[in-house]
Amino acid sequence: MNIFIVGPMGSGKTTVGKIVASELFLDFYDTDGTIEEKTGVTIDWIFDIEGEGGFRKRETLVLKDLVALNSIVLATGGGIVIEDENRELLASRGTVFYLHTPLNTQIERTAKDKDRPLLKNKNASEVLINLQNARQFLYEEVSDYIIDTENKSGSEVAKEIVKLVKNYG
């Protein structure tokens, strides 16, 4: 059983994924973390040197490796759904949970984080609105379940996912 978590930046994918993996005794992976591990540099550095296009290519390569594994929980980067190939990989190899997160929550959570290349030196609210408009339907398209994260802690969201997995597989 593979569990894939998608959603915008600031939705809590990594936090929730770690809890779900622990509860279900599965291995946890994070696409961004795996990219940093393999390259030895930060996502921010990759964006600066290779641009978003270079990062997306790396992301797809890492995703191919990770979806080939079994019994994992995978927290994906917010933009992973942009590429058709990535959506196909996710949909064909596991159960996909979309963490639907209101814009105001995303803004609050990302305001303190300086490691968000897409928000660097930009109006964060405007960027997040544009990203939501461009990606929300892609998250919905690829997901098996949509989890509303509004006013919920990471552990509350994780409990919902664990319950769904235990009840419906």
What are these regions (language model features)?
Residues 22-60:
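Conserved substrate/cofactor phosphate-moiety recognition/catalytic segment
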Residues 19, 23, 69, 133-169:
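NTP-dependent small-molecule kinase module
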Residues 92-136:
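A glycine- and Lys/Arg-enriched "phosphate-lid" helix/loop adjacent to the NTP-binding pocket
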Residues 11:
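ATP-binding Walker
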Residues 54-95, 150:
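Glycine-rich phosphate-binding loop used to anchor ATP phosphates in small-molecule kinases
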Residues 5:
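Hydrophobic anchor at the beta1->P-loop junction of P-loop NTPases
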Residues 14:
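Walker A/P-loop
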Residues 8:
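P-loop (Walker A) phosphate-binding loop of NTP-binding proteins
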